[in-house]
Amino acid sequence: MGYIIAVDQGTTSTRSIVFDDQFAIVGQGQEEFEQHFPNSGWVEHNPKDLLATVIATCKKALNDGKIRAKEILALGITNQRETTLFWDKVSGEPIYNAIVWQDRRTSKFCDKLRSDGVEELITRITGLLLDPYFSATKLKWLLDNVEGARSKAEAGELLFGTVDTYLIWHLTNGVMHATD
């Protein structure tokens, strides 16, 4: 018999659940992690905490279900969408905390884009509303405000993604840089 692990990497905790071939829960684990609020309206997570809680909760779920890792057929990840980060392409080290989906630090930049008259264009091209929730303005903030980020990105030394991308990259030992 094989098993599936479902990982829910959420905003305040990570939960992993092992299911059998009838989709019955056979093991689970959950861990909370620290949120960081460096300024008003800012919300960040340490990416290493996110990865550590995924690994720890998977181990707890396997132990809880008395399952061996080699019995796992697949792993699925659901995560806090639009939480974004950069990490070093070689070492895997994050260059800054992950900026959480709730973060509002790019509100003024979004307002400027609106006043410049590009909101409709952005929505037409992306299908998304102009809002700090989405990754693009966070990406710009990271490039503009994290020392060395822009030059490292231009040199091809950084990877960017949402939390699922970061987790997949680390769980595959840097083989896969992907998202859904």
Residue positions per predicted region:
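A broad, structural surface signal
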Residues: K48, A52-K59, N63, D111, ...
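Glycine-rich phosphate-binding loop and adjoining helix at the ATP-binding site
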Residues: I55, F86-G148
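Short active-site oxyanion
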Residues: L73, N97-A98, K152-E157
